[in-house]
Amino acid sequence: MRKPAILLVFFFTAAACTAQLRWKKADSLYAPLPASIHVWSCNDTLNGFPFIAFYTSVRLKDKALQFTAQTGEGKRFTPLQYYQLEQFPLLVVNCSYFSFTTNQNLNVIIRDGKMLSWNITALRGTGPDSLLYYYPTRGAIGIDRQRKADVAWLFTDSSRRWPYAFEDRPVVAKGIDSIPTIYSLNDIEWKWWKMRTAVGGGPVLIHDGKIFISYRQEQLYPGDDFEGEHLPRTAMGYTRDGRLIILAIQGRAPDLAAGVTLQEEAQIMLSLGCYEALNLDGGGSSCLLINGKETIRPSDKMGQRPVPAVFLVKWNK
């Protein structure tokens, strides 16, 4: 009967530690920036591990700014190459998971209201379910035409213009169809997710103002201790007062920056005021550029890892 108490103490200790992180404004290091964008840095310790991170806070209603995404159209480019190809945006950050073999994005990407990439819709079952398929609904963050952000669990269909969104919870379903439709999920509580810009990843970290890490429900990394591993991380969320929060955490440098667990990442996003938040691809992919300058140091041995998609903040022309 003592275990729940121990876990509760750990949870509150972790929450207290993230709340005590010492963030310093770093706008001047990445100038010039509009008044609606601020950059913060932190070089501290977190739960006994060295910690380095940066985050940006961007006002969504600033009509001088454009929030968009771009893909490599079957190729992969480094964030710096996207910065050059996209004519020097204010911000570039990695986002979706992908295949190293095919360069395919494995999550939804929406640009100008058009889906450029789709989620994985079926995964082969294992063990007793080896003859079945799992149908994951994975997290994404989007911004609509009114510049309102949302995080939802999605099912995508390349024959449909919009993703199917589940706002209350991820759907966990399985069946015999290798190419499922929305009806394979046996859930009618969905809506069309009409976003102008969106990027996918997973798992969701915060839902309706509370930590809810849904990596098991999203069927991410089954069998791995993904939740408890210290890794470089990228996350994106939004606040109730209309600010987009983009977080990049350095890692895989034990004496300099250890990275964080998913629980720690969620606590950080909550402490930054996020009402909802999403984990994005991390590890060697984590990279955040402000005005073309690196914030965290990427952990990939070659430097910035080429990725097939990025999220961008640009000047609105």
Annotate the PLM regions.
Residues M1-R22:
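Bacterial Sec-dependent N-terminal signal peptides
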Residues Q20-R160:
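Zymogen propeptides
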Residues L21-D44, V151, F212-I213, K293-K317:
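Flexible, D/E/H-enriched segments
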Residues L46-P50, L132-Y135, T197, F226-H230, ...:
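A short catalytic or substrate-binding loop motif that flags glycine-/basic-rich loops and adjacent residues
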Residues P50-Y55, R138, G200-G202, L231-A235, ...:
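Short glycine-rich loop/turn motifs
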Residues K61-K63, F98, K148, T156, ...:
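Short, glycine-/Ser/Thr-/acidic-enriched flexible segments
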Residues T102-P128, L220-Y275, L280, S285-K317:
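Conserved, well-ordered active-site substructure
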Residues N103-D225:
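Active-site-adjacent helix-turn-beta-strand microarchitecture at beta-sheet edges
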